[in-house]
Design a protein with these regions (language model features):
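The feature marks the mature, well-folded catalytic cores of soluble enzymes
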Residues: 1-84, 107, 123-373
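Intrinsic disorder/low-complexity segments
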Residues: 82-127
Length: 373
């Protein structure tokens, strides 16, 4: 949650209002865990906007933080392959995993159980049916301070917030926003990010791929070499340009303006998408999201994108930018990709001033991470 010591300070009131909107949307459908420097103040802010039923779904834990991009420092979860599964791996990564059976099967009925008393007691009885992978986060290649953010996983785990086995992978830098997993053995990523300076050098791309396969239980890593948005200081996270959806569908960012400096790179990305296949050799159904009209902050272009949506139980929360035609097209395409799900647009113009959006701010956890009662 943003506070006075984060980069959000110059527009703290505006971003807090946006965070409250996101919290309300999530808590309406599923449990919500918030890490906050000032939990009492956050609780008071939420109580002004959330219903009593929504507040019942909210748990707030005191944690100091450098920034607010939970996607990149939070645990990446592995769940065991279903009994009788034909997937020849130990488990499946669920950083984002729509499946043929439905959207985010790992998240349906997701519950984080909390009761009054010493939370540490729960850690002793946690349901150990999942693995919580704790990779090193170094502020996107040592661009920004990350010491406090790097402690949040351990702090919450020690307090019994999450069940399962914590696996320490501090020897490898990996951000949640840099990968997309279908839960069936395919992981999407970008070479511009994973091979960027100050992450895992001097490892080669082949060596990085082997680590990803072993630790994420993946059968195939699909690398994209194009599509970094102007203003994206993560070096090109996949969750800003290409997203996995049900039925082997990909929502991706396209550009029609040949005068846009991003046009050639996004066109090259589109060509790669057309020939990409999953771990079973199946091609993807492609749905092309519009590019928002350019947004600027102090003359610098911001990485506005509709691809940075968040999938929750029964809904998809989509960033919008007060651009009537583009917003409507994007929401309609997300609805086409996620039939049966509520589509919720949230104005993300304040969020993108810090070069991210809704998916970047959040991390989902599967039902298998719930604590034993």
């Amino acid at each position: 949650w943003p506070h006075e010591n984060t980069d959000w300070f110059p527009y703290l009131d505006d971003i807090t209002e946006t965070f409250v909107q996101i919290a309300k949307a999530v808590a309406h459908y599923e449990p919500l865990v918030i890490a906050a420097k000032h939990p009492d103040a956050v609780c008071a802010e939420l109580e002004e906007s959330l219903s009593a039923e929504e507040m019942e779904n909210v748990r707030i834990y005191e944690c100091d933080n450098n920034d607010t991009w939970a996607r990149d420092h939070a645990f990446i979860t592995l769940i065991p392959a279903a009994e009788g599964s034909d997937i020849p791996i130990e488990g499946t990564a669920v950083s984002a995993a729509p499946t043929e059976q439905g959207v985010c099967d790992y998240g349906k009925n997701a519950v984080v159980s909390f009761e009054d008393g010493d939370a540490s007691d729960y850690g002793k009885n946690a349901v150990a049916s999942c693995r919580l992978l704790d990779f090193r986060f170094n502020g996107w290649g040592e661009k920004f301070a990350a010491d406090k953010d790097n402690l949040i996983n351990r702090t919450l785990y020690a307090r019994g917030v999450f069940g399962g086995e914590r696996v320490d992978y501090d020897d490898f830098v990996l951000e949640g926003g840099s990968i997309e997993s279908d839960g069936r053995g395919t992981v999407l990523t970008t070479s511009v990010c994973l091979m960027a300076p100050n992450r895992n050098q001097p490892m080669t791309q082949a060596e990085v791929e082997q680590v990803l396969k072993e630790r994420l239980c993946a059968r195939k890593i699909v690398w994209f070499d194009h599509g970094q948005l102007i203003g994206d200081d993560t070096d090109g996270h996949i969750d800003t340009i290409v997203r996995l959806c049900p039925d082997n569908t990909l929502l991706y960012v396209g550009c029609d303006d040949e005068n846009d400096p991003q046009y050639a790179d996004l066109h090259a990305l589109e060509q790669q998408l057309k020939v990409a296949t999953d771990a079973d050799g199946n091609p993807y159904r492609l749905l092309r999201l519009p590019m928002p009209d350019a947004l600027y902050d102090d003359g610098d272009r911001l990485p506005a994108t509709y691809a940075n949506f968040l999938i929750i139980n029964g809904a998809v929360i989509v960033p919008t930018y007060a651009q009537e035609e583009n917003d409507a097209r994007a929401l309609a395409l997300v609805a086409e990709a996620f039939p049966g799900y509520d589509i919720i647009g949230i104005d993300s113009r304040t969020i993108v001033r810090q070069h991210g959006s809704i998916h970047c701010l959040t991390m989902q956890y599967p039902a298998e991470c719930r604590l034993a009662k």
